[in-house]
Amino acid sequence: MLIKTGDKVRVISGKDRGQEGTVKKVISAKNRIVVEGVNKIKKHQKPTNVNPQGGIVDIEAPIDASNVMYLDPSTNEPTRLGVRREDGKRVRYAKKSGKDLEN
């Protein structure tokens, strides 16, 4: 999976289509990602030492990685990602602009 934690992405399909956010977590075994502020669900939590109140909380649920596209930092437009080798290292790049991305 070419999307990494901290990348800016835009949701391209589903109930949250059009929303943008930062990737908080990548679950590569299931090809899913957690995006900040996207796919919010309500979860009932029991009281714990950390949260003595308990109750209903809003959390971000994972969405499939195919439902998001990386946002090119130079143009702020969705783009596909590619990988090429430079000096024996893998370098990610935006396919629309051709610019390298810091890993």
From Swiss-Prot:
Part of the 50S ribosomal subunit. It comes from Lactiplantibacillus plantarum (strain ATCC BAA-793 / NCIMB 8826 / WCFS1) (Lactobacillus plantarum). Belongs to the universal ribosomal protein uL24 family. Transmembrane segments: none annotated. CDD domains: KOW_RPL26. One of two assembly initiator proteins, it binds directly to the 5'-end of the 23S rRNA, where it nucleates assembly of the 50S subunit. It holds the Pfam family ribosomal_L24. This is Large ribosomal subunit protein uL24. Keywords: Ribonucleoprotein, Ribosomal protein, RNA-binding, rRNA-binding. One of its GO terms (molecular function) is structural constituent of ribosome.
